[in-house]
Amino acid sequence: KFPQLTEPNASYHGISFVQAAGPAAFATYIRAILLRDTGAAISPFNAFLLLQGVETLSLRVDRHVENTLKVLEYLKTVPQVESISHPSLSTDPEQQRLYKTYFPNGAGSIFTFDIKGGEKEAKAFIDALEIFSLLANVADVKSLVIHPKTTTHSQLSEQEFNEQKIFDNTIRLSIGTENINDIIADLEQGFDAVKALNA
């Protein structure tokens, strides 16, 4: 049934992994053959870096959430913002209950908002940002911005755009760990560019 385990393997001294390792045949095959052939293991230094990152993850997440909540409060005061989509802002009682139950410390740093206007205004806003990087990644330590309709979701149909609430004026932000005053100043710079565009 599993010839790679039961039959002699010419590339590994002609052994049968079932005969040589018994119940550990599959694990031995993975280590002796697949790991050797594909290199599917990180180097010791990469393992060290991964561990370093995991050890400080909770601190970074706290900062992401703290910054995000402050950005949301700021965006609620901006006249050029048409709407904001973040779990903490839902007015639905059931969604609020779920938010408080499952995200007592905040629901992360990724959300969208709709700027007044259309694609031209959205792109002017994005182009004016300096701290935010124009990238499709999410949850990076640095703040990120993207126009979903023309990038990450561009393959969708108009019906799918409407179902997903992705419009010409939708902007996705991923709030990073930078100083909150710098983040908000950068967003203000974006809104100033939109004002200048429509002046």
Please state what every model-predicted region is.
Residues 127-128, 143-199:
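PLP-dependent enzyme catalytic core of the Aspartate aminotransferase-like
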Residues 109-114, 171-175:
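Short cationic amphipathic helices and targeting signals
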